[in-house]
Amino acid sequence: MQEYKKNRVSKVAFAYCMALLFMIIFISSTFFLTSKRHIPNTEKDQYALALRGSIITKDNFTITSSKQIYRAEIDLRSINKDKFDLFLKLFQIYSGISNDQVADIKKRMQNQKKRSYNFVLLQNLDSKQASYLKDLAKKLYIQGFFKAFTNNSGRVETRGLNIIEHEEDRIYMSKDSFTPIIGYTKMILDPESGILKNIGVKGLEKYYDACLSPVQNEKIQGLKDIGGNIILNLNSLQQKKINGCDLYLNLSLKLQKSIEKAINQRNEDLKANEIIVGVMESKTGRILALASSRRYDPQNRGKDLSVLNASAIEYGYEAGSVIKPFIFTTALRLGKIKMDEVINTYGGSYKLGRFTIKDDHKMDKMTMEEVIRYSSNIGMIQIAKRLNNIEIVSGLKIFKFGEKSGIDLPYEQKGEIPNPKRLRDIEKSVLSYGYGLKTTFIQLLAAYNIFNNDGFYITPRLAEKFYQNGRFTNLDDDVKKEKILSSEAAKTMQNVLINVIEKGTGKKAITQGIIAGGKTGTARIAERQGYTSNRYNASFFGFANDLNHAYTIGVLVRHPTKPYSYYAAQSALPMFKDVVDILINEEFLTPIQDNNQTSTNN
C-alpha cells in the first residue's frame, strides 16, 4: 500500500513538471514571436534613372547625349581588415584603376572617421566599369567574402560592395560648336530616385526641355536576399524606363563647323566683340546654321555669363541701313513712290535740324532704286516725309518688327519700335535709315527672307522633328507661314537688292553663277550718354540662290575694332561672301552655268 502511494506521488510530480515545462515553452514562444527580432529587412526598392534625350544634327551626328555615372561604396563593417588588401586588388582588376588610385583609396581609409562606416571607394564610374564591379560584388557575396553585422537599427545585414547610380552626365561631343544656341543644363536631385539629373537652362536644351526630359524611371520592387539583391518573381514589381525624346535639328554639323571656322579667321582681323552668322532655307524657314564667335564649352562654362546668351535673339540693337528696304517697300506698297521716279538728294548734303546728313555717294538726284543701291540717307528722308507716323510704324509692324519671330529658342527679345503718337519729324527721318528702333538679328533674317520667298513670312526653325516611343513627330505645326507682300512687290525688292550687289555698295559679294542680293548697314552703338564716335555695329542681310535652292543669309559684326572695319562693306559684306563660298563648297549651292548670268567675278 505504501509502495502504491509512493508511485502515485511520483506520477503527480512528473505531471506537474511536464505542465510547468510546457508553460515555460509556451511563454517563451509567445515572447519570441511578439518581441522585436533581429532579422534582415526583406523589402527593397531599386531605381535606375531614365536618361535625357540626345540632340542630333541634320547630317545625323549626335552632338549631345547623356550617360549614367556610378560610384562604388562599401560598408567597412562587411569586410575583415585582413582581407582588405585582397579586396582592393580584385577591385583594381575589375575597375581598371591605377596604382595611384588604389593608394588614394587606402589613404582616405586611414583618414576615415571611426564612426563613419560607409566608405566611397571610387566615383565617376561609367556603365562598363559599373557592370564589371557588379559582377565582382556578386561573386564575392556568393563566396561568403563579406560578413554580416548588426546595423544601428538592430537588424542583421550583409552590405558588401555596392555600385550606385548617382548622377546623369550630359556630354557635348562637339565641344563649343553650336553654342550658344544649343544651350546647357544644370543638375537637380530627382525626388523619386535620389539620383542627380539634368534640366535645361539655356538654348535648345531649355526650349525643348519637356521633350528631352525623361518620362519614367526604371523601378524594381520586391523581396531581397541576405546579400541585398532583389529576388525577381511573380510578386516583384518592374517598371520600364522611358527616356526623353531624341531631338533632330535642321542644323548641319559640317556647315556649322565650316562657318564657325570662317568666323574665327575673319575675326582675327576684325577684332570684333562678336560676329553672328545665320543661314536659313528660304522656302521652309529651316535654319541650317546659326553661328557665333562667342562660344563656350557647355561642360566647362566660364565666369563671363554674357557669353552664355544667344545674341542672335537676345541682343537688341539699332540696325542702321539694313532697315531701309522695309521703309522703302512700305512707301512703294502704299503708292507713295514709283520705281522710275527721280528724287532730290541735294548733292549728298542735307540739313536735318541742327545736324547735317551726308551721303557717301554725293549725287544731286537719284532714282528710287538708286536710293537703296547707294544707301542714301538723304533719299530715305525724302521718302519718309511722304509717310505719316502711323504708315511708317505700321509698315515696320507688317514685317514683324516689334514682335518675337517665334524661333524655337527661349528668352527671345521682341525689340522696340516707336509709338506713332510720339514720333516727331526728326525721329521719323532717322527711323527711315535705321535709328530709333531696336531689332534683333533673327528678326532681320526672317524679315529679309520675305523678299526671297515670294512675299511669305515664315517662322525660323532650328529643330525639325523628335523621336519617341518608336516614332517620329514633325515640328512643322509650330511654323507660321503668312503672306506679307504681293509676289510682285517681293520680286521688285528682290531685284533692287540684287542691284545693290551687282551695281552698288555690295560688289565685294559678287559670286560667279550665284544670284545674290542684300543690303549693308552700319550704325553707331547707343549708350547711356548717347552715341559714341568709335563703336559701331555692321550688318549685311541678303540672299544667295541657284536654279534650285534659295538661302537667306545674315551677318552681324558687333563693334569691330580694326580701323575703318566698322563700315559694313569692310566687315559684314566679306563675311557674307565667305558664307556663299562655303555654301558652294559644301554643295548647298551650285553655280549656274549660263553665259547670260549677270553676276561676274570681282
Language-model regions, residue ranges each:
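Beta-lactam-recognizing serine transpeptidase/beta-lactamase-like catalytic domain environment
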Residues: 62-64, 224-238, 275-321, 326-561, ...
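Periplasmic/cell-envelope proteins involved in peptidoglycan metabolism and beta-lactam response
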Residues: 1-300, 390-400, 509-512, 528-531, ...
